[in-house]
Regions:
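Histidine/cysteine- and/or acidic
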Residues: 89, 141-143, 175-177
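Conserved donor-nucleotide/metal-binding helix-loop-beta segment in metal-dependent transferases, i.e.
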Residues: 105-144
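N-terminal anchoring/stem segment of glycosyltransferases
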Residues: 2-3, 7-95, 119
């Protein structure tokens, strides 16, 4: 996977839900999709435990239904996330950090992650990357950026549970099972 060295901001309305000084009044939940307890997943799990994060792993024990690197197939992952967020759809004080897990380790605690999130001044922040995948013909549709990478990466984003849920339901049903 491409390292997420930069963040691309997706602004969904003005301002943020909570002030920076309200970090202690917010919960931070980490959500991921993984089907097997690989070495990479166990490493991710240990890093989350080290910082006392609640981790919700979706899809564990199921066969992978998210496609492969040859073509797009993220609909299954999105639908699992949508189901999980529906349980939290009214929780404006719960911040959800959705991330890949097989190639990720958490290196900071709640205060540092929420402080960094707050510095963007946006309700939802996505990771970004230098490649337009899986459909490079969409590259021209992405705006130019002054800092960081240009293309959204679904392997890392953060926002309140309610804002993420509303974003996902506004797009209709996701392709893929």
């Amino acid at each position: 996977m491409v390292a997420r060295a930069a963040m691309l901001v997706l602004i969904l309305g003005a301002g943020v839900d909570m002030a920076v000084d309200d970090i202690e009044n917010r919960d931070l939940v980490i959500v991921t999709v993984a089907t097997n307890r690989t070495d990479g997943y166990r490493r991710f799990e240990r890093s989350c435990k080290l910082f006392n994060f609640e981790v919700r792993t979706l899809g564990m024990g199921q066969g992978w239904k998210g496609g492969n690197m040859a073509y797009a197939g993220g609909g299954w992952k999105v639908n699992l996330l949508k189901e999980e967020l529906e349980k939290m759809k009214d929780e404006v004080n719960t911040i959800v950090m959705f991330t890949d897990s097989y190639d990720v380790v958490v290196t900071a605690g709640k205060e540092a992650l929420l402080s960094q999130f707050d510095t963007f001044g946006s309700k939802i922040v996505f990771g970004s990357e230098g490649f337009c995948w899986p459909d490079s013909s969409l590259a021209k549709s992405y705006p130019e950026v002054k800092v960081g990478k240009r293309y959204l990466n679904s392997g890392g984003f953060i926002g309140s549970a309610s804002n993420l849920y509303n974003m996902l339901i506004s797009g209709g049903e996701s392709r893929g099972k």
